[in-house]
Swiss-Prot record:
Organism: Staphylococcus saprophyticus subsp. saprophyticus (strain ATCC 15305 / DSM 20229 / NCIMB 8711 / NCTC 7292 / S-41)
Keyword Ribonucleoprotein in record: yes
Family the UniProt entry places it in: Belongs to the bacterial ribosomal protein bL12 family.
Protein name: Large ribosomal subunit protein bL12
Pfam families per record: Ribosomal_L12, Ribosomal_L12_N
GO BP term (any one): translation
Function: Forms part of the ribosomal stalk which helps the ribosome interact with GTP-bound translation factors. Is thus essential for accurate translation.
Length: 122
């Protein structure tokens, strides 16, 4: 069995897509979720949770008809390689970027929608 240092080193060398797949596999294997417990507590606090939200996740829900343009836009926005960006777009719905300020998230959403993608802010 690998020790903690070996596991951490293996994780350091994984791509974003590989890490995403790893998280999903861990969630399924152990019946847990990687969702932040703070978000659940904030939602229970009352109706002001939406007004206070400052960080947004940009989720690609569909690539639309011009998938090549969307792959290029995702590659540019995330800094991923072409193969990883294509896998991310092919696997939609997927979160492209997490915890962005509202203005930056809206700019990314607009840029992706301009090339034909369907995008949601969460």
């Amino acid at each position: 069995m690998a020790n903690q240092e070996q596991i951490i080193e293996a994780i350091k060398e994984m791509s974003v897509l590989e890490l995403n797949d790893l998280v999903k596999a861990i969630e399924e294997e152990f019946g847990v979720t990687a969702a932040a417990p703070v978000a659940a507590a904030g939602a229970a606090a009352g109706g002001d949770a939406e007004a206070e939200k400052t960080d947004f996740d940009v989720e690609l829900t569909s690539a639309g008809s011009s998938k090549i343009k969307v792959v290029k836009a995702v590659k540019e926005a995330t800094g991923l390689g072409l193969k990883d960006a294509k896998e991310l777009v092919d696997g939609a719905p997927k979160v492209i970027k997490e915890a962005l300020p509202k203005e930056e998230a809206e700019k990314l959403k607009e840029a992706l929608e301009e090339v034909g993608a369907t995008v949601e802010l969460k």
